[in-house]
Amino acid sequence: MAKEVSKVVKLQVKGGAANPSPPVGPALGAAGVNIMEFCKQFNARTQDKAGKVCPVQITVYKDKSFDFVVKTPPAAVQLMEAAKLKSGSGEPNRKKVASVTWDVIKAIAEDKMVDLNAFTAESAMSMIAGTARSMGITVTGDSPLKK
């Protein structure tokens, strides 16, 4: 028989750097999870993503055991990394802060494909390009997307 789910907690934590302080501690403490056990498992699983923001979905069961799934870093974080930015534009329609090429968009889309709600690489690229546009990042070069 399957375990009964008590709660699902979603967090964004830097890879390899989970510790019991906020936001991890309070969120998991309220769910009754052994915080140190989660931190050890998360840090071991995300050593290769050290320093990058990693969304994680933690499923807590009635017996206080847990499972978690680490997802790919958010598209906005990957775009800022590619464009060497600290933050996006406050006024993306008026003030453009950087530019990236379609090759960068394609690389990010391929990386995020498992987490995106897209069936084709083109639709994933369109989503990533939209995220870039909303951050004040222009996409340069000829668009490989169908018109």
Curated annotation (Swiss-Prot):
Database matches in Pfam families: Ribosomal_L11, Ribosomal_L11_N
BP terms from Gene Ontology: translation
One GO CC annotation: cytosolic large ribosomal subunit
InterPro entries: Ribosomal_uL11, Ribosomal_uL11_bac-typ, Ribosomal_uL11_C, Ribosomal_uL11_C_sf, Ribosomal_uL11_N, Ribosomal_uL11_N_sf
Span of the signal peptide: none
UniProt keyword annotations, A-Z: Methylation, Ribonucleoprotein, Ribosomal protein, RNA-binding, rRNA-binding
Source taxon at top rank: Bacteria
Heme recorded as keyword: no
Function in brief: Forms part of the ribosomal stalk which helps the ribosome interact with GTP-bound translation factors.
Protein name: Large ribosomal subunit protein uL11
Protein source organism: Flavobacterium psychrophilum (strain ATCC 49511 / DSM 21280 / CIP 103535 / JIP02/86)
Gene: rplK
